[in-house]
């Protein structure tokens, strides 16, 4: 797409071409959404301690534009960390349903991902993906805070790619 500019010299026109970015509104919205994720914490076990460390001074999740929210109505990402029991499942689903669209879920740790060491217990859900759709899985028992930050960055990439292609990315 060539844009005709009146009154620019050749050097000035090259400068304009290097500094003007063209995008779609959907890509711009995807970039904005991925740059300001507001997670809702659903910490249930030892993984929650590692999740709390991400908000501390050493890792400082705020510098990436993510601010922990206490209300599901203000959040767009749910971080489930720890063992989810069958009695807790309806509450988890209710919180997910209260979040506004678009919304994403991160399963942090082996307990949230597949039941962890309690997988053979009658009361443990064998993965949070049986209750809510999960976008990013973070392995580990417990995963360190750097792994959670990496998972959040992977979610940001996924959001941008979905906005760019217009298709759901698995």
Swiss-Prot record:
Binds 1 [4Fe-4S] cluster. Keywords: 4Fe-4S, Cell membrane, Iron, Iron-sulfur, Membrane, Metal-binding, NAD, Quinone, Translocase, Transport. It is an enzyme of class 7 (translocase). Its cofactor is [4Fe-4S] cluster. [4Fe-4S] cluster binds at residues 46-47, 111, 141. InterPro entries: NADH_UbQ_OxRdtase-like_20kDa, NADH_UQ_OxRdtase_20Kd_su. GO terms for cellular component: plasma membrane; respiratory chain complex I. Its main location: membrane. GO terms for biological process: aerobic respiration; electron transport coupled proton transport. It is a peripheral membrane protein. Belongs to the complex I 20 kDa subunit family. NCBIfam families: nuoB_fam (TIGR01957), PRK06411.1 (NF005012). NDH-1 is composed of 14 different subunits. Subunits NuoB, C, D, E, F, and G constitute the peripheral sector of the complex. This is NADH-quinone oxidoreductase subunit B. The lineage of its organism: Bacteria, Bacillati, Bacillota, Bacilli, Bacillales.
């Amino acid at each position: 797409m060539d844009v005709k500019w009146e009154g620019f010299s050749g050097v000035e026109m090259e400068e304009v071409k290097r500094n003007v970015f063209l995008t779609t509104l959907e890509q711009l919205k995807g970039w904005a959404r991925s740059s300001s994720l507001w997670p809702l914490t659903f910490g249930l076990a030892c993984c929650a301690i590692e999740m709390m460390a991400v908000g501390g001074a050493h890792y400082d999740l705020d510098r990436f534009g993510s601010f922990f929210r206490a209300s599901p109505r203000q959040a767009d990402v749910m971080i489930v960390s720890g063992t989810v029991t069958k009695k807790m499942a309806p509450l988890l689903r209710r919180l997910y349903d209260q979040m506004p669209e678009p919304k994403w879920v991160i399963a942090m740790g082996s307990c949230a991902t597949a039941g962890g060491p309690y997988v053979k217990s009658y009361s443990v859900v064998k993965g949070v993906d049986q209750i809510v759709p999960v976008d990013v899985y973070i392995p580990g028992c417990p995963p360190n805070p750097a792994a959670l930050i990496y998972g959040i960055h992977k979610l940001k990439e996924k959001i941008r790619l979905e906005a760019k292609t217009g298709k759901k990315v698995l």
